[in-house]
C-alpha cells in the first residue's frame, strides 16, 4: 500500500516517548508532519531530527505537530530523545506496520526517509519518500506545504 497526496491518511496507534501511545486520530483538527526516519543515532537521522527540533517554532507557529517514526524500540527512542532533547515524540513502529501503511519501507526492510503533511481533516497534502536517504526535506519546504494545505 502507498499513500498519495489527496488520500485519507491511515490511522495508527503505536507507543511513543513519554510512556504513552500515539495515534493519528488524536490530532484530528490539527496539521501533522509525519516523519519516517531509518534509525536512532545515525548521522543523517540525527541531523534531520535536530534540525526539525531546532526549528520547531516554525512548525508550531503554523499549528503543526511533528511526529517522528522509526522501527527502533522504545528504549532506543527514549535514549535518543533524551540525548538530543527532542521536543516532539518519537514513535516506535517495531513491526513496521505503520511504515507499510504509508509505503515507506525500503528494500532492506527499513523505513525510507519520508515526510507527510496531513491536514486538519486527515488528508495527505504533501508526501516525499527518499530513494537514497542522504538528505532530508528542509523545514522551509515543509512549512510551505503546511501553509498551502491551509
Predicted regions and their residues:
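Chalcogenol-based redox active-site neighborhoods
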Residues: 1-150
Amino acid at each position: 500500500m502507498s499513500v498519495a497526496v489527496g488520500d485519507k491518511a491511515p490511522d495508527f496507534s503505536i507507543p511513543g516517548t513519554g510512556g504513552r501511545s500515539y495515534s493519528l486520530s488524536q490530532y484530528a483538527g490539527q496539521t501533522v508532519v509525519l516523519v519516517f526516519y531509518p534509525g536512532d543515532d545515525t548521522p543523517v537521522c540525527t541531523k534531520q531530527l535536530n534540525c526539525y527540533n531546532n526549528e520547531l517554532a516554525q512548525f508550531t507557529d503554523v499549528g503543526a505537530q511533528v511526529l517522528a517514526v522509526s522501527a527502533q524500540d522504545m528504549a532506543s527512542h527514549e535514549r535518543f530523545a533524551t540525548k538530543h532533547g527532542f521536543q516532539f515524540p518519537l514513535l516506535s513502529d517495531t513491526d513496521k506496520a505503520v511504515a507499510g501503511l504509508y509505503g515507506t519501507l525500503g528494500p532492506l526492510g527499513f523505513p525510507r526517509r519520508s515526510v507527510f503533511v496531513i491536514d486538519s481533516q486527515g488528508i495527505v497534502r504533501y508526501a516525499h519518500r527518499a530513494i537514497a536517504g542522504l538528505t532530508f526535506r528542509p523545514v522551509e519546504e515543509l512549512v510551505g506545504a503546511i501553509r498551502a494545505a491551509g
